[in-house]
């Protein structure tokens, strides 16, 4: 079986870190142990600097980051990560487990910011070509639940401080995109933790077994 790229998506507070741990545990039980982990934005020296610029409220002083500048920084970080980390890992037979990928931009910037979706799709195709994750786990949680969890963790970044309306639009776009793409599996992350973990295990196990079929 060739290596695969699995991405975990969701709003702030959806439980992506816990989900990643469950995915890793499940893959190991299935005999898959050669894995690397990525996060977006970030994952390379350049991408981490861009992450700081786009998420750290203090990084640009009083200057307002425009919506299009934000999108372009996300894509600059993403293509650097894809070309220098993700693709080489996959080519070497290593599975890649990612905390966010392009679906985040389509949801946050396309839904939350209201940026033209055709423009975003065109930009994605120009930058990434046909490169896509093999499996995406979208952890669906309401902004009320997710932001309560995120705020309990401590200081919020620039995007985490957006309004409930912003996150409601983002969630709606996530759900819309998930309904259109069979590679995106929606997990109800408002359930008790054990139920969420079981759903992730079942989804990943069944998906890997289908690859072997």
Swiss-Prot record:
EC number(s) stated in the UniProt entry for this protein: 2.7.4.9
Listed SUPFAM superfamilies: P-loop containing nucleoside triphosphate hydrolases (SSF52540)
Matching InterPro entries: P-loop_NTPase, Thymidylate_kin-like_dom, Thymidylate_kin_CS, Thymidylate_kinase
Highest rank taxon of the organism: Bacteria
Catalytic activity: dTMP + ATP = dTDP + ADP
GO BP term, example: dUDP biosynthetic process
MF annotations from Gene Ontology: ATP binding; dTMP kinase activity
Pfam families in the cross-refs: Thymidylate_kin (PF02223)
This protein's record includes keyword Kinase: yes
GO cellular component: cytosol
Keywords associated with the record: ATP-binding, Kinase, Nucleotide biosynthesis, Nucleotide-binding, Transferase
Binding site for ATP: 10-17
Task performed by this protein: Phosphorylation of dTMP to form dTDP in both de novo and salvage pathways of dTTP synthesis.
Family affiliation: Belongs to the thymidylate kinase family.
Name of the protein described by the UniProt record: Thymidylate kinase
């Amino acid at each position: 079986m060739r290596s695969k790229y699995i991405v975990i998506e969701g709003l702030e507070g959806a439980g992506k870190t816990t989900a990643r741990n469950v995915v890793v545990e499940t893959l190991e039980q299935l005999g898959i142990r050669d894995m690397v982990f990525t996060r977006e934005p970030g994952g390379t020296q350049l991408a981490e600097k861009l992450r700081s610029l786009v998420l750290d409220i203090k990084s640009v002083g009083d200057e307002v980051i425009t919506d299009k500048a934000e999108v372009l920084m996300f894509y600059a970080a993403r293509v650097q990560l894809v070309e220098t980390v993700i693709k080489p890992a996959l080519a070497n037979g290593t599975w890649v487990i990612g905390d966010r990928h392009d679906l985040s931009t389509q949801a946050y910037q396309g839904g939350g910011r209201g940026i033209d979706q055709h423009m975003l799709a065109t930009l994605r195709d120009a930058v990434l070509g046909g490169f896509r994750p093999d499996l995406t786990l979208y952890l669906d949680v309401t902004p009320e639940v997710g932001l309560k969890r995120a705020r309990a963790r401590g200081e919020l970044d620039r995007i985490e401080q957006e309004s409930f309306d912003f996150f409601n639009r983002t969630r709606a776009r996530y759900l819309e995109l998930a309904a259109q793409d069979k590679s995106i599996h929606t997990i109800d992350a408002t359930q008790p933790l054990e139920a969420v973990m079981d759903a992730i295990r079942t989804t990943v196990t069944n998906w890997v077994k289908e690859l072997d079929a």
